[in-house]
Curated annotation (Swiss-Prot):
It is found in: Membrane. Pfam families: V_ATPase_I. The gene is vha-7. Residues 259-292 are annotated as: Disordered. The keyword Ligase does not apply. It is a multi-pass membrane protein. It comes from Caenorhabditis elegans. This is V-type proton ATPase 116 kDa subunit a 4. The chain crosses the membrane at residues 716-736, 761-781, 856-876, 893-913, 977-997, 1128-1148. Disruption phenotype: RNAi-mediated knockdown does not affect embryonic or larval development. Subunit of the V0 complex of vacuolar(H+)-ATPase (V-ATPase), a multisubunit enzyme composed of a peripheral complex (V1) that hydrolyzes ATP and a membrane integral complex (V0) that translocates protons. V-ATPase is responsible for acidifying and maintaining the pH of intracellular compartments and in some cell types, is targeted to the plasma membrane, where it is responsible for acidifying the extracellular environment.
Length: 1210
């Protein structure tokens, strides 16, 4: 491909046009190579530009002239290299010149344009500066222009990429208003209309002529006489980028949205762009930049989609889950958005599908719901959804009819069954009265005594037994309504009798069946126990009372024939009707089951399509919609995923079959980007621990990578038992080994999922616990003598016998002290961990407590210091150098002068002070009783208390408080200096940053005032401020980064408006750090406390449960019985020991150590550098939507299993 390395400037007024004409080379030999290097910008921009960066300008861009006129021609002497010449008909445009009073201000004026190009850099040895044809009067202009242009275009050049492979790209960019969040109404349809018209005008060869017509009032840009030479290889697919154009005039006068892109395509053939290949080529290099130590770089993009292709493009993006869309309609109601009708249709389809799904789950025999296939996330077409909607509507109506018919049939069946039971019981009641004459004779033969007995029994107000109550007074009545029969629930039998008896004032008699029968509820199919009742009464008033009581108890009354013959006929008819109803119900259920069985395989597919449709339309409701149907939205995309997103948009564009390709342009914004950390199944649990405290701010140091090591280690320090750690490790390995089986079962138990989700952190906690258990030489409260103890018994047999005899005589135990000079061999020091001799020593707690306490202090101070050093990474990243000077350095010095000094004392005491009398640091050390007390010494250090030097006085006698004196030379002077330095660091931390901010702010204001005065003096006139808002062209400038992101990182809001806020914040931060160093150091002593508690509980479990349980049979005198019981007792004791160890030592103690380790990381460690006030990156991912839908299905299935046999009816 030919290149252009020479530049021809159209001169301004007062310049010599002949000089410009002479710039054109006369032959191809005069052309330099295609590469050229430019300097690092003007002095005013050198802070923004790295001199080592190189840029290739193809074709050369002329930003210092009001009108750029370029002609593609062939060089003389047969050279094929094209070059630029001056267009002879040049008319300068006064409006563009008036836009800026001075050309040096063009690149700084918010109303101006910048000419950008994103090609590869020229090489240094072919610089255009070495061209012999360039005269010295033009050369400074070229250099000045290049410096100014490159300095302003630095960040933009990094983000622009060639739109089509192997083709040149000319970019014209305007600044975006970063402070104005208003989104103006745009007519996106005219963008594409303008592009088509320009595309047609670029199809012919000739002159490429750009005419800029710019005024402050109109702010218009026009393209005139656009022609491309057909012989030029650069005449294809040139791309022009425009940003923050409020009004742009082209042939069709389109109104452009910020960051819109218009493609001008000529008729000459060109290689097609393949976004998929580009994504594969660039994604690997971009992904290497991502790291877990900081959040992924995020970019805000504007996405413009034609309405016909919007669904396919958004659905294709949802397959990857790497885009977070911004809701541009947050102030609008959900019911007033564009695609609310589509959302309602999806919700209605989902409702119908859930209804059908419940029919499948609750049918008999049961059908297991199928799972959704997450491998294929392809979106359904609109035709498929219309067909699905019709099918669901048809199935819903069909099943509603089936349910209603089934309800009616079952209700009739229950009624027939109840009626049959009533007639049977009534027939049994009246079996002894088959003939009417027999009944009359029975009434007349009743004696007076019987009647008196009957009346007396009711005269006392008692309630006789219903089944023993005589019926004689009512049987001879001529009234037809003398009894009522029916059924009622069995559990209401006794209360029904009592209420009816009292309501009728003891004048009605109730008989109920002793045996009950079962009917199924027609709605829920639950079995119901019912019984038959008969109420005997006389009179219309009693009949009304009986009916009201029956209604109150939900009792059903049935008309029963008086004669036995009629009753038997009715029973025969009822039995036949019941058989017919049973056949119809069985046939209906068979048909119903067949439909549901076939439908159970289709429901997951339907549910997936509905959820995809619903999720996509929910995202599309976040877009703003033009009146002509174009959608514009904003989204956050990880920088490493940009190519994948563009490829997804390209695939969606192809699937839609439209002609307008989607637009994806980067935007500048002051809004804080979301935080996105890439994790896998191993690191996810550690990132979740950090995010539970607070999501890190954008690009803030992420504590999760360090937590992977420090969290299990601190846990193991408190849980230091090798045996318990091994059990924990085996449990974690079981979960890891059976991951696929456990996930396939889809267990929804919350407690189980908590342990399963933390399987990898359990594995690390188990490994570190085994390590610390070996350090402590502790396993089930027992030590292992692997390498041989360095201690030995220095007592002979005679001395031991004497001590034993004395212990026997005194009836007490004596402890023998092993003298180190005689009993310890320094050459046989235990190589790893604690010597096993301490496990049987009486003073083991004194030794281990001192060791663990000091080790906890060292570990805590080390982690806090590490956290302070991590804070400097944030300061460097955000270029907050004032924080390094006023916060980081004083904090490190403060920690070093007090707490690191304490750690050094601990280590020195361990190394140099022993039980032997020797000379230590120039002082005669008498022995272990004079070992320096570090805690009291630290207190005396702050109190500046006068102490003795050394351990012996002038007479060689040991001081009474020798452990409180100075134990190394010049200790008082050293400690005084350390205290003074640490106290001097406090005002630096308190006032350093606020005073610096005040100084820089006042200096900046003065510089701005001086610059404004100079500009007014140079122009000689007073220039009124433009009506349009002044914006910065490009990304935010960070000359004074310590006043921008650094403060935002510390406070989380803009603090420049009030200096008092800075003082208050810095005071809080300083007090928190100074007091926190003391309290946090004491907080790390929990490492020692929990380790001690765990060791003591282990010892209690071993000796008091296992050992003592095994020896309980030792007191049995019969050896045979003792030998038989000992294995049983040992098994029982071991079972109790194992149960208590698992429940208390591993579960409870493990949970306690976990929570304490969590607190040490959240408060003591992360408070030194971590704010955690960001917001997470929530990407639009179709798989997550489908998983939520699957959870609803599984929950429905679980509830159906709980209430097995229920039948849904709507």
């Amino acid at each position: 491909m030919s290149s252009f390395s020479n530049v021809g400037f159209v001169p301004h007024d007062g310049e010599n046009e002949e000089d410009a004409i002479n710039l054109a080379p006369k032959s191809s030999e005069s052309f330099p190579a295609e590469d050229s290097i430019f300097a690092d910008g003007s002095p005013r921009h050198r802070t923004l530009f790295d001199s080592k960066k190189r840029f290739k300008l193809r074709p050369p861009l002329l930003a210092s002239t009001p009108r750029v006129i370029c002609r593609f021609q062939q060089a003389s002497s047969g050279s094929s290299a094209p070059y630029f010449t001056r267009e002879p008909t040049f008319q300068p445009i006064q409006e563009f010149i008036e836009m800026s009073e001075h050309f040096h201000d063009i690149t700084e004026n918010s109303q101006g344009y910048r000419f950008l190009n994103t090609k590869e850099p020229f090489s240094r040895h072919h610089s255009a500066l070495h061209h012999p044809r360039l005269s010295f009067d033009v050369l400074p202009k070229v250099i000045d222009f290049s410096r100014r242009w490159i300095g302003r275009a630095r960040d933009t050049l990094y983000r622009l990429s060639v739109a089509y492979s192997g083709q040149e790209e000319l970019g014209i960019e305007r600044a975006r208003d970063e402070l104005d969040d208003r989104r103006e109404h745009i007519n996106l349809s005219e963008i594409f209309g303008g592009s088509h018209s320009q595309e047609n005008s670029c199809s012919s060869g000739g002159v490429f002529n750009l005419n800029f017509d710019k005024s402050i009032e109109d702010r218009q840009l026009s393209f005139e006489n656009i022609d491309l030479d057909s012989t030029s290889p650069q005449s294809t697919n040139d791309v022009i980028w425009l940003r923050d154009m409020t009004t742009v005039s082209t042939i069709s006068e389109p109104i452009l949205h910020p960051s819109s892109k218009i493609s001008f395509t000529s008729s000459s053939p060109s290689p097609q762009r393949n976004p998929k290949n580009e994504a594969q080529k660039n994604s690997s290099s971009k992904r290497e930049e991502t790291s877990m130590f900081r959040s992924d770089p995020m970019k805000l993009y504007q996405m413009i989609l034609v309405k016909e292709a919007a669904f396919e493009c958004v659905a294709e993006i949802g397959k990857h889950g790497n885009v977070q869309f911004v809701d541009l309609n947050a102030k609008m109601s959900l019911y007033s958005r564009t695609f609310v009708k589509q959302m309602r249709r999806c919700e209605e389809m989902e409702r119908k599908l859930r209804f059908l799904e419940k029919q499948v789950i609750t049918c008999k025999p049961g059908l297991d719901p199928k799972s959704i296939d997450y491998t294929d996330l392809s979106a359904p077409t609109q035709a498929e959804m219309i067909q699905l909607e019709h099918k669901l509507d048809q199935l819903e109506r069909e099943f509603l009819d089936l349910n209603n018919n089934d309800y009616a049939l079952r209700k009739n069946l229950n009624s027939s069954k109840e009626f049959l039971q009533v007639m049977r019981l009534v027939d049994e009641f009246f079996q002894v009265h088959k003939e009417e004459e027999a009944k009359a004779r029975f009434e007349r033969s009743a004696t007076t005594d019987d009647i008196e007995m009957f009346s007396k029994s009711f005269g006392f107000g008692g309630l006789p037994s219903s089944n023993e109550m005589p019926l004689t007074p009512l049987l001879g009545s001529d009234d037809n309504a003398w009894f009522v029969a029916g059924v009622l629930p069995l559990d209401k039998k006794e209360s029904f009798e009592r209420v009816l008896w009292r309501a009728c004032r003891r004048t009605a008699f109730v008989r109920t069946s002793d045996a009950s029968f079962t009917v199924n509820d027609p709605v829920t199919l639950e079995p119901l126990q019912k019984c038959v009742f008969i109420v005997f009464f006389k009179g219309e008033s009693l009949r009304l009372i009986v009916e009201k009581v029956c209604d109150g108890f939900n009792a059903t009354q049935y008309p029963c024939p008086k004669s036995s013959k009629d009753r038997k006929m009715k029973m025969s008819e009822t039995e036949g009707r019941m058989n017919d109803l049973t056949v119809v119900i069985d046939t209906t259920q068979t048909h119903r089951y067949t439909i549901l069985k076939d439908m159970s395989f289709e429901i997951p597919i339907w549910l997936k399509n509905i959820q995809i449709q619903k999720s996509v339309f929910a995202v599309m409701n976040m877009f703003t919609v033009d009146t002509n149907g174009f959608l514009a939205g904003e989204c956050w995309i990880p920088a490493a995923e940009e190519d994948d997103v563009r490829q997804a948009l390209h695939d969606g564009f192809k699937a839609s079959g439209t002609e307008v390709e989607p637009i994806l342009n980067e935007l500048w914004t002051n809004a804080p980007p979301p935080t996105f950390h890439r994790t896998n199944k191993f690191t996810n649990v550690f990132q979740s621990i950090v995010d539970s405290y607070g999501v890190s701010q954008y690009c803030e140091v992420n504590p999760a990578p360090y937590t992977i090591i420090t969290f299990p280690f601190l846990f193991a320090v408190m849980f230091g038992d090798a045996a318990h750690g091994a059990i924990l490790l085996l449990a974690a390995l079981f979960f890891i080994r059976n991951e696929r089986k456990i996930e396939s079962k889809k267990i929804r138990d919350e407690i189980f999922n908590t342990f399963y989700g933390g399987r990898y952190i359990m594995m690390l906690m188990g490994i570190f616990s085994i390590y610390t258990g070996f350090l402590y030489n502790d396993a089930f409260a027992k030590s292992f003598n692997v390498f041989g103890s360095g201690w030995s018994n220095s007592y002979n047999e005679t001395q031991l016998d004497w001590w034993i005899a004395r212990s026997y005589r005194k009836h007490r135990e004596y402890s023998l002290e092993l003298v180190p000079e005689k009993s310890f061999d320094i050459e046989k020091t235990y190589p790893f961990g604690v010597d096993p001799i301490w496990n049987i020593a009486d003073n083991r707690l004194s030794f281990l407590n001192s060791m663990k306490m000091k080790a906890s202090v060292i570990i805590g101070i080390t982690q806090m210091t590490f956290g302070v050093f991590l804070s400097v990474l944030n300061h460097i990243h955000f270029k907050s150098y004032i924080d390094i000077i006023s916060n980081f350095i004083p904090q490190v010095i403060f920690l070093s002068c007090i707490f690191i000094y304490l750690c050094i004392q601990i280590i020195v005491k361990w190394i140099f002070f022993s039980v032997n009398a020797e000379n230590v640091f120039g002082f005669e050390y008498p022995g272990s009783h004079c070992a320096p007390s570090l805690l009291i010494g630290l207190i005396n250090m702050f109190m500046f208390k006068k102490r003795n030097e050394g351990y012996l006085n002038e007479n060689g006698e040991v001081y009474s408080n020798c452990h409180l004196g100075y134990w190394y030379p010049n200790q008082r002077l050293v400690e005084t200096i350390l205290i003074s330095i640490s106290l001097a660091c406090i005002p630096i931390m308190l006032f350093g940053k606020p005073l610096w901010v005040r100084f820089v702010t006042s200096k900046r204001h003065k510089l701005q005032e001086n610059k404004s005065l100079k500009s007014l003096r140079r122009n000689g006139t007073t220039v009124s401020a433009p009506t349009s808002p002044v914006v910065d062209a490009g990304p935010p400038r960070f000359e004074d980064a310590e006043l921008l992101l650094a403060d935002e990182l510390d406070i989380g809001e803009d603090i420049h408006h009030s200096l008092s806020d800075i003082f208050v914040h810095q005071a809080i931060h300083t007090i928190e750090f100074v007091l926190g160093c003391v309290s946090h150091t004491a907080s790390y002593l929990r490492l020692w406390a929990l380790s001690l508690a765990h060791a003591q509980l282990s010892e209690v479990m071993w000796h008091m449960v296992l050992i003592q349980g095994i020896h309980t049979v030792d007191h049995i005198e019969n050896e045979t019985i003792a030998m038989c019981l000992k294995p049983v007792v040992a098994c029982v004791a071991f079972f109790i020991f194992a149960s208590l160890s698992l429940s208390i030592l591993i579960m409870m103690e493990g949970l306690s150590a976990f929570l304490h380790a969590l607190r040490l990381h959240w408060v003591e460690f992360q408070s030194k550098f971590y704010l955690g006030t960001g917001h997470p990156f929530h990407a639009f991912y179709l798989k997550e939507s489908l998983e939520n839908a699957q959870l609803i299905t599984e929950e429905t299935d679980r509830l159906a299993d709980i209430s097995s046999g229920q039948h849904l009816h709507i």
